[in-house]
Amino acid sequence: MKPQEFPVDPEHIWEHFYQLTRIPRPSRAEAAVREYVVAQAEAHDCRWQLDATGNLVVYVPASPGRERHPTVIIQNHLDMVTVKTGDKQHDFYRDPLTLQVQDGWLLADRTTLGADNGVGCAAALALLTDPDVQHPPLELLFTVDEETGLGGALGLDASLLSGRVMLNLDTEDWHELYVGCAGGAGWVFSRDYPLQPAAGGASCWTLELKGLAGGHSGIEIHLQLGNALKLLVEALADVASCQLAAASVGVAHNVIPREGWIRFACDTVDAGALQQRLEALQRRWHSYLPAADHGLELLLQPAEPAAVMSLEHSRQLLQVIAALPHGAQAYSLAQPADLVDLSINLARLQVVEGRLELESSIRFFNPEQAAGLRLAVESLAQLAGLHIRRIDGYPGWQPDFASPLLARAKALHERLFDSVPAVKAIHAGLECGILKSKLPDADILSFGPTIRGAHSPTERLRIATVPPFWRYLTALLAEL
């Protein structure tokens, strides 16, 4: 049910967003939410088409008198990142979200909210259902599988679209207009390790780390947030007799890992020394990690005896994880100093019955700049005997500061809000880069209300930014 303080203005956006929070919509499981959009289209006598990938386009006729204006594409993705805290019982494939309002923010109870990109989807649906909005012909493009590799945009049948002006509503800082985004690529490293009984006299332990902030591996990578995988490996670095048994750290390629555990065997002396080091490790991390990470906990618990990797293989794997880069690698010389040009996210580790999977991803504006980082990462993986599977990359969106759409949007913002909007590129993989490659003559702009903590259980939407966002969107459409 809606929390008592659930916002009501603008009515159409908030009602659609609430309905979207009732419908499970993980990546690659968007059928139910797509059915909701189709139902809205049919209820308002709008034609729609579906491509082979599952992307949906709804064709909204122009307001009376606007029929000859150029068609505008409104683009959003249907899926959401599905992350929860370790103590939260929630099935993202079945359960609706539990909403809360705190200090002017809308959030979910210990799960992602899906405002990324649900609030944009809600705005697109509001354009369909609000009879008071004046607009040209619209093509509402709802893509799928954005969060796990931009699969919907990559597979889009562009022949479904006639518009050459596009508004993407998937950025997260109000009063900012985005005209460029990073490209990306990644790897999954794997290996099967033989297992053996733990050495005589060894005991089994589980080292768990929780309480980090985590977050978006693009727009928050420059914040120097703690990486649970790097910290766990650092904690085990001095355990000379460590033999790995199992591990689960991180959830997805585009999420900075916030919690996880590693199970291992070691001799009694090493276990005792590690137990004594836990508080010192946490104090050291607190001394340099941002305040958002100061809730971290490091717990060492006895575990049931288990088969383990050899001492040599365990050392080798821990060393390669310690050596693999993570975080911002280069900053722009042309844009504001906080714009990251090149980054890498060491995202996920799974070890189950000797089977290793290790995932990492990079983001970049210039693919040539990423070549050296790619070489370094793959060289480390080869030294550790890991099988390398490259994840297909996607293009960035090169900024066009001479865009006619941008000029009109800036002027409108100044008139409506008496302020000059910031014009930026974003270090994240918006679908705009792929869509621009499919529609090379399209003029594209991205904006949205304020969201914080995307891709984490602290994701929240600033309620007060939604009314001016809606006012701006509808005013811009009235001018196009």
Predicted regions and their residues:
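A short beta-alpha structural unit
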Residues: 18-22, 261-263, 297-309, 345-349, ...
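Acidic/His- and Gly-rich active-site-bordering loop/insert found
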Residues: 4-105
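A structural supersecondary motif
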Residues: 241-251, 334-350
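Fold-level recognition of mixed alpha/beta catalytic cores in primary-metabolism enzymes, strongest
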Residues: 136-228, 236
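His/Asp/Glu-rich mid-to-C-terminal helical/loop segments that flank catalytic regions of hydrolases
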Residues: 159, 225-239, 270-271, 315-325, ...
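Active-site metal-coordination/substrate-binding segment of hydrolases
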Residues: 66-164, 314, 325-326, 332, ...
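Zn-dependent metallopeptidase/amidohydrolase metal-coordination segment
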Residues: 13, 342-343, 347-356, 361, ...
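A conserved active-site cap/scaffold subdomain adjacent to cofactor or substrate pockets
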Residues: 222, 253-328
